[in-house]
Amino acid sequence: MDTQTNTAADSLAEILHALRGIRAPIQQGEYDLHDLVRASLAEAEIPCAHEVPLAPRCRIDLVCPGGIGIEIKRGQPDRKRIVMQLTRYAACGQISALILVTERTVAVPNRIHGKPISCVC
């Protein structure tokens, strides 16, 4: 594994570790979840950009160093729609990996366009 790949994998592991500690109160709005995720990343000293445009009409909730994109969904998202959305994001060159943060588990592929996909709920 080359150094760049190892660094991306390390960054992904660090971000996942920070996000797995989130415990969202019931009845949060989606932007409240955005705030919880951003606070968790800040506590772990992981910078992120919010509402990042990747392409025309294609904006992801957060992007962390190394091109790790985070999409946040409240409730039980529709699997077909979320996979289509993640597929659009994974097709963008600036994204190296994706993390889906949801309140409930959604079955998503492990990889899309060769990029790792993780789900945190």
Give, region by region, the residue ranges found by the protein language model.
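Amphipathic coiled-coil/heptad-repeat helices and related helical stalk/stem segments
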Residues: 55-56, 82-85
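Hydrophobic beta-strand residues in large extracellular and virion-surface proteins
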Residues: 37, 48, 70, 99-100
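Surface-exposed alpha-helical segments enriched in charged/polar residues
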Residues: 17, 39, 84-91
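Nucleic-acid nuclease catalytic cores
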Residues: 76-81, 90-121
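Catalytic centers of nucleases
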Residues: 53-65
